[in-house]
């Protein structure tokens, strides 16, 4: 549990930092491109961008540390590259069944799945995309992260790619389930939906 809290607390500063930047950039783009202002879409996009910033802080942004000379990038650390599919997944299930340890299951196994559910949920929510496009978005982002981690003090594991993609699919299933019940509300978040309010000139 402490490791989960540490990851979440590490995400928050980056999510807070990106918020004003996103708002400023978005306002400029809306003005320059004369876009219709849709509060539903903008709020959804705001949350999605904040999530991406938090995800990046735990995956591709090098760890930072405060020292006497200020903030420094921590380049030292553990590196691991695992390219055998399902190896980590099998180890996780072994730990659960044989050793009755759920640590890897909760933090790494389920964490990798839950962490990518927003891709499967927000991509079709905010843009008119097919199921394949939404799934491919999560897969490509995960692939980019795993390749990037080869050059960072982080771990690269092909099972992460598998679990991340599974999480994207689950997020997509959640979106489709909610849309089947709240179609009118969910469609308001997409580009091209009637503007909820005219953007002030």
Regions found by a protein language model. Give the residues of each.
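Bulky hydrophobic segments
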Residues: 1-155, 173-201
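Loop-to-transmembrane alpha-helix initiation sites
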Residues: 156-157, 161-162
